[in-house]
Amino acid sequence: MAGLTDKALVRERFRRTLGSYAGEAAVQRAMAQELVSMAARHASGIHFERVLEVGSGSGMLTELMLEAFSIERYTANDLVEESRECLQGIMDRHPEVVFNFLGGDVESLPFLPERRDLVVSNATLQWLDDLETFLGRIADSMAPGGLFLFTSFSSSNMQEIAAILGTALTYRSIAETGELCERYFEVLELREAEITLTFSSPEAVLRHISRTGVNALARKPWTKGRQKEFSDRYRSMFSQAEGVRLTYNPVYCCLRKRQEGSL
């Protein structure tokens, strides 16, 4: 990733969208559902003792995980402290689970919960400054044979926005992601997809982006003139029969920590 991410700005933008995220983030919900399906395919059973979720947000993945698996202890981390409030209602419906919330930037935490047999993260790792260091820390915190499943985005993500405005995030290619993962884990599954959404207008695209927080690094104000220029260019470049398109390029990854003594 080029440059360092302004985590304070990311925190504020996502804090503002906590209430609208679940209703607007259809792609991220589909990614979370696929993450759960991957876990079911690669896990030896449906029971996990210690789970860590990185980037819990509004609780979209949290709820799916607790519905799909038997979990003893669940630790959720998010940059936005208010995520704890979103998760509380979910946890109240699962009193059998020992729950802990770990607020703050996961890259800056002095420690990570240890001996996790499952770590999950949905649509979050693209915000990290140093993915390799993070992968190493996660591997060190996991029990041998534990699974780490994550979704993120690859280099063609939101290519329409990048074509007009330039891109604030420089997404890694799937090859780059795979190379980093192989340094610390056995790669069980790594693939990418393309999801195209259709909106009635460029203005609807901007509303969608605003409500999901994926514009979290956008600093330049949207004047009427700038919005008109954006809309005119977007419509001329990316129109289709039903409106205009927006492309997502999700990545799905399942990793296993190598057994002690194995290469």
Curated annotation (Swiss-Prot):
Disulfide bond entries: none
Substrates-to-products reaction catalysed? malonyl-[ACP] + S-adenosyl-L-methionine = malonyl-[ACP] methyl ester + S-adenosyl-L-homocysteine
What does UniProt give as the signal peptide span? none
**What sections of the protein cross the membrane?**
none
Keyword annotations from UniProtKB, A to Z: Biotin biosynthesis, Methyltransferase, S-adenosyl-L-methionine, Transferase
Q: What is its EC number?
A: 2.1.1.197
The pathway where this protein functions is: Cofactor biosynthesis; biotin biosynthesis
Query: Which processes are annotated in GO (biological process)?
Result: biotin biosynthetic process; methylation
MF terms per GO, please?
A: carboxyl-O-methyltransferase activity; malonyl-CoA methyltransferase activity; S-adenosylmethionine-dependent methyltransferase activity
One Pfam annotation, family name?
Methyltransf_11
Q: Which family does it belong to?
A: Belongs to the methyltransferase superfamily.
Q: Which NCBIfam families match?
A: BioC
Q: What does this protein do?
A: Converts the free carboxyl group of a malonyl-thioester to its methyl ester by transfer of a methyl group from S-adenosyl-L-methionine (SAM). It allows to synthesize pimeloyl-ACP via the fatty acid synthetic pathway.
Q: Please identify the protein, giving its name as recorded.
A: Malonyl-[acyl-carrier protein] O-methyltransferase
Source organism of this protein record: Chlorobium luteolum (strain DSM 273 / BCRC 81028 / 2530)
User: What taxonomic lineage is listed for the species of origin?
Assistant: Bacteria, Pseudomonadati, Chlorobiota, Chlorobiia, Chlorobiales
Encoding gene per record: bioC
